[in-house]
């Protein structure tokens, strides 16, 4: 079942934790690629110096952040790596959750090809398929084309995992500082990164 629009409303930190264990799905050329979300970071808008929307900055790039929750915010870093975010909070409140790492589930062969141009890969390469925001976007074929797409779409959405299959019973959720935001002054220390402790696909222990 797809996560309904109401799933993305409410406090961004709570939505971030709710996303853990759910499945990010992207249909590419009719083939389902997906992974279980195992690591996220919350960004809380105008008051968060690490957020693109800090101070209420409104640009062509960040416009989607000011819109309805439950949409995709995709951007480039270093001019080459895509990052996928889920927009949260009410319209006009530019907050979101960065998906940092996934455990691959569906379309594994397509994911391998997208990452390594081959399907015969080592165990180390397998662990590196989706253990970072740029890696998971490459693996799932998420690009700037997906910016602003509703997560109610058939091709890009969050699939809710039934409780009996949910990995939250196997892993403890841990909170800590976000990664690579050295510019963000006091916001560097906010414990707004959430991940499954000990999960092999988490990007940084």
From Swiss-Prot:
Q: Which domain of life is it from?
A: Bacteria
Q: Which UniProt keywords apply?
A: DNA damage, DNA repair, Hydrolase
Q: Which InterPro entries would you find in this protein's record?
A: Formyl_transferase-like_C_sf, MPG, MPG_sf
Q: What is the protein's given name?
A: Putative 3-methyladenine DNA glycosylase
What Gene3D superfamilies does UniProt report for this protein, alphabetically?
Answer: Methylpurine-DNA glycosylase (MPG) (3.10.300.10)
* Family according to the record: Belongs to the DNA glycosylase MPG family.
Q: Which GO biological process annotations does it have?
A: base-excision repair
Q: What is its EC number?
A: 3.2.2.-
**Signal sequence, start to end:** none
**Source species, please?**
Bacillus cereus (strain Q1)
What Gene Ontology molecular function terms does this protein carry? alkylbase DNA N-glycosylase activity; DNA binding
């Amino acid at each position: 079942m797809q996560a309904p629009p109401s799933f993305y409303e409410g406090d961004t930190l709570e939505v971030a934790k709710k996303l853990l264990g759910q499945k990010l799905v992207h249909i590419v050329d009719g083939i389902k690629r997906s992974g279980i979300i195992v690591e996220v970071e919350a960004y809380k808008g105008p008051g968060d110096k690490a957020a693109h929307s800090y101070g209420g900055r409104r640009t062509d790039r960040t416009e989607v952040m000011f819109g309805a929750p439950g949409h995709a915010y995709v951007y480039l870093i270093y001019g080459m790596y895509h990052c996928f975010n889920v927009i949260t909070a009410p319209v006009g409140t530019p907050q979101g959750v960065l998906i940092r790492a996934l455990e691959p589930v569906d379309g594994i062969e397509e994911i391998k090809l997208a990452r390594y141009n081959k399907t015969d890969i080592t165990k180390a390469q397998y662990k590196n398929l989706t253990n970072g925001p740029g890696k998971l976007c490459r693996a799932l074929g998420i690009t700037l084309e997906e910016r602003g797409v509703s997560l109610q779409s058939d091709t890009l959405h969050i699939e809710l995992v039934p409780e009996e299959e949910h990995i939250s019973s196997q892993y403890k959720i841990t909170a800590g500082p976000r990664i690579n935001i050295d510019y963000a002054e006091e916001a560097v220390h906010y414990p707004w990164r959430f991940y499954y402790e000990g999960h092999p696909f988490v990007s940084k222990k």
